[in-house]
Amino acid sequence: MSNLLPFIGSFLFLASGIFYSSGGEKTNTSPFRYVPAGHHEKLWDSAKINPSQVFRIDKSISIYLENKQKYVNIEKMRVGGVPSAIVFTLHGRESTWHFGKHLHEGSRLTGRTRYVPKGRPKASPKNGHTYTFEESAEDALYKLKDMESVNWSRCNDALYNIEKYNWLGYLRYHRDVNSPYLWSGTQHYRKGKYVADGRFSSTAIDKQLGTCALLLRMQSRGIKVGFR
């Protein structure tokens, strides 16, 4: 086992199809071959929000409306940037809309990320002591990952890349469970989740709102989500 450590330390493969060096930097991408054609779009077209979640979703959407310019600014950091509504949903999943936490994985902006991806951003905070939410978001979306290259106007591409932002373990290892990262709060998700990195429970229930539950409601209220 000790002979394998240098190799393991050099490269970690995530199910997202992106290789990361031990420093957490992108090295190259490879196609992911576990997704049926149109998989995400078909789920979107048939998705219904659980009635019990509508009030909670609307309350969450008020956070977007109150802070919309912050999310728009992140979208505008790059040509073809991540739509502001999608940035908002990722922010909810990763750090419960806390502007003092990293968009990568929810640790505090007072230091680099503590979990996967660990040690981001690589650059020191511009003010010398604490990262801003904008610095963190730019690193998470556009430096660590190149999400500006996604065609966000296409539903299937958009939803696939939202799931990929989390990871594609459900598609690869648990095809009977739709990722709660997207579908929690809709009829497409009931139970089963990763309770820790690489540890899946078939009985655990994800109680966070899924990104698609939020986006469906936003779209129904006339808020642009980036596709359709």
Question: Where are the language model's segments positioned?
Answer:
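Solvent-exposed, polar/charged alpha-helical surfaces in well-ordered, non-transmembrane soluble domains
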Residues: L65, Q69-N73, F88, E135-E138, ...
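Non-catalytic cell-wall polysaccharide-engagement segments
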Residues: F19-G38, G119-R228
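Second-shell loop/turn segments in exported
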Residues: S52-I63, Q69-R78, Y115-Y131, S201-A204
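N-terminal export signals and maturation junctions of secreted/periplasmic proteins
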Residues: L12, S16-N73
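Solvent-exposed loop/turn segments at secondary-structure junctions
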Residues: R93-H98, R108-L109, M147-E148
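Short, functionally critical alpha-helical segments immediately adjacent to catalytic or ligand/cofactor-binding
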Residues: G81-H98, A140
